[in-house]
Design a protein with these regions (language model features):
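Short, conserved, GDST-rich strand-edge loop motifs in beta-rich repeat architectures
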Residues: 132-139, 189-208, 267-271
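Acidic, Gly/Ser/Thr-rich repeat motifs that build Ca2+-stabilized beta-propeller blades
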Residues: 30-193, 248, 256-263, 321-359, ...
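Beta-propeller fold detector
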Residues: 54-55, 92-99, 156-165, 225-233, ...
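Short loop/turn segments immediately following beta-strands, especially the blade-tip
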Residues: 147-156, 217-225, 273-281, 355-361, ...
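Conserved blade-ending motifs and adjacent loop-strand segments that build the rim/top face
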Residues: 362-382
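Repeat-solenoid scaffold signature
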Residues: 235-274
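Blade/loop signatures of beta-propeller domains
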Residues: 28-52, 154-157, 223-231, 293-309
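Secretory targeting signatures
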Residues: 1-35, 403
């Protein structure tokens, strides 16, 4: 008898190999590029898993982020379709809807991230990142935007949204978009390499391009400014580069930045550096801890990176149905057995790991639990629950007290 876990992997593998609605255009990914599966939920946990999983909230297209409100006892959860919903434990309400401003023409487009302004108690502002409106009947490619909006009477007025930065996109995929507030009016913004297979325009190693980077900026009173004033150009926004699609990242109590960077054909990556130590993570000269070639050669031996590049601290291969990393929270909360490492998972298999550091300073991934979901991210619930964001639009809370 085929178990749910086996069936899930088989179905996803079939989806990835066959044409389907929602797959990437050939102009975005060359075969055998990743093919998005249909949104068909298979459940949260398989059999014989010593944990419980409950629906926390549903009705989303694809939930992307959750943040605790700075001044109210509620959590805000963003949706790829352009909405943000607030949850106070008893009532769910719509607090933002910028769907008229965004594009959902591609499976990786939409409202990608948001953050409360670090001085929210005084400014009552929210920052957004999104892909701009496009004509889905054409192959129109629209740009990546960073914007702010005013919160008035608990909701964001669409007419208050102001564009702060615009980054030109050559393709529709690899948009990144995560926003992380560092405090004192400073933020990190993840930007993908612009899409297409194999970084066709070489953005990852182009020092003048904002694509394939993590941007670092100051925002206060409606004004944005770079924090690395070395060239007098937009290059001064770039802190880290050489990334393919830094979908999620987090900072731990030691001010180390943990990045889940989605791989090409062979390896998924977790990178870690001091948050303000400008770094080049090697894409597209390297994938994982190897030189990158087009077409990809997953059998190449590992090699030392050039002196100016930083390899990931942890990689995993595309095997046993694994396909795409999703991060990621550094766990200094939650179940004791899950603390002390960066939490990450795989979109296709639903497996969840935690980074562990060995005595020699190397890092490995400890498999914590095997879910049945198509994971797109993690969050923290109103009462400290570990939330799982899924491709199918459901937010689950995972009780791991028995793990």
């Amino acid at each position: 008898m085929v178990g749910l876990r086996t069936l899930s992997v088989l179905l996803i593998t079939m989806f990835m190999l066959a044409p389907m609605s929602g797959c990437l255009d050939n102009e975005d990914e060359k075969p055998p590029g990743f093919q998005w599966p249909d949104r068909a939920e298979t459940g949260c946990l398989g059999e014989d898993v010593n944990a419980s999983c409950e629906v926390y909230l549903d009705g989303f297209t694809t939930p992307t982020n959750s943040l605790h409100h700075p001044t109210k006892n509620e959590v805000w959860i963003s949706d790829l379709d352009g909405r943000i919903v607030a949850w106070d434990g008893g009532q769910q309400r719509l607090v933002a809807n910028i769907s008229n401003l965004i594009s959902n023409c591609h499976t990786e487009a939409g409202l990608l991230g948001f953050s409360f302004a670090t001085d929210f108690a005084n400014a009552s502002q929210v920052l957004f990142t999104y892909i701009g409106k496009a004509n889905c009947e054409t192959k129109e490619v629209t740009n990546l935007y960073l914007a702010s909006g005013d919160v008035v009477n608990g909701t964001v007025a669409e007419n208050s949204v102001r564009v702060l930065r615009e980054i030109e996109q050559p393709y529709r995929n690899h948009n990144g978009g995560h926003l992380l507030a560092l405090g004192d009016h400073t933020y990190l913004w993840g930007v993908g390499d612009g899409g297409g297979s194999n970084d066709p325009q070489g953005h990852g190693q182009n020092e003048t391009s904002p694509l394939g980077t993590i941007q670092h900026f100051h925002y206060h009173n409606g004004t944005i400014a770079p924090l690395h004033n070395t060239t007098g150009t937009d290059q001064d926004y770039t802190l880290h580069r050489g990334l393919r699609n830094p979908w999620k990242f987090d900072v731990d109590a030691q001010n180390r930045l943990w990045i889940a960077d989605v791989g090409q054909q062979c390896f998924e990556e977790v990178s870690m550096v001091p948050v303000l130590q400008a770094s080049n993570f090697g894409w597209s000269e390297r994938e994982g801890n190897r030189e990158f070639t087009d077409p990809s050669d997953c059998t190449k031996p590992a090699s030392e990176p050039p002196a100016e590049m930083t390899d990931p601290v942890l990689i995993y291969e595309h095997e046993n149905g694994r396909c795409s990393i999703t991060g990621g929270l550094f766990m200094d909360w939650g179940p004791e057995a899950w603390q002390g490492g960066y939490l990450y998972g795989d979109f296709c298999t639903g497996e969840i790991w935690r980074t562990t550091e060995g005595a020699d300073g190397s890092y490995d991934g400890e498999l914590l639990i095997d879910t049945e979901t198509m994971l797109v991210g993690f969050g923290k619930g109103l009462d400290g629950e570990l939330l799982l964001f899924t491709w199918t639009g459901t937010v689950y809370s995972l009780d791991t007290s028995g793990v």
